[in-house]
């Protein structure tokens, strides 16, 4: 949030160039921008469920800042859509020594699981 405020942008995201694990997407949108574009967004059925698609489709109209990691770890999947995904995340939790799993620990555990 601090970086979003500091950059003074309309949208602050990690979705344009994906470097974070799947399931770890972040989109912070200035509420004034949402209010200003509500009418345009509501007219298109395609944007009703995924409002942010409107901003990306019209990115020349908005100040969008993408933040990313130096090391791309987007191949790691933390989204739970299947039983396989669930079992992977369950294994990550089981292999963790702590309740909090930071990014560096996540990478270590992921690499450990890949070797199993």
PLM-predicted stretches and their roles:
Residues 29, 48-116:
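Conserved alpha/beta core of the MobA/IspD/sugar-nucleotide pyrophosphorylase nucleotidyltransferase superfamily
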Residues 14-26, 71-72:
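A recurrent flexible, glycine/aromatic-enriched loop bordering the glycosyltransferase active site
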Residues 1-19:
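Conserved donor-nucleotide/metal-binding helix-loop-beta segment in metal-dependent transferases, i.e.
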Residues 10-13, 35, 44-48, 61-65:
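Short, structured loop/turn "capping" segments at alpha-beta junctions
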Residues 24-56:
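Anionic-ligand binding region
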Residues 15-16, 41-45, 95-98:
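Short C-terminal domain-edge/linker segments immediately following a structured domain
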Residues 22, 39, 74-77:
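Conserved short-loop catalytic and cofactor-binding motifs
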């Amino acid at each position: 949030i601090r970086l979003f405020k500091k950059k003074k942008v309309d949208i602050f995201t990690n979705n344009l160039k994906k470097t974070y694990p799947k399931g770890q997407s972040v989109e912070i949108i200035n509420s004034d921008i949402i209010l200003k574009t509500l009418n345009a967004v509501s007219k298109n059925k395609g944007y009703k469920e995924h409002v942010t698609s409107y901003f990306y489709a019209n990115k020349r109209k908005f100040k969008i800042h993408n933040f990313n990691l130096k090391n791309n770890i987007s191949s790691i999947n933390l989204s739970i859509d299947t039983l396989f995904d669930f079992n992977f995340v369950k294994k990550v939790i089981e292999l963790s020594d702590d309740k909090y799993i930071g990014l560096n620990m996540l990478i270590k555990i992921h690499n450990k699981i890949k070797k199993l």
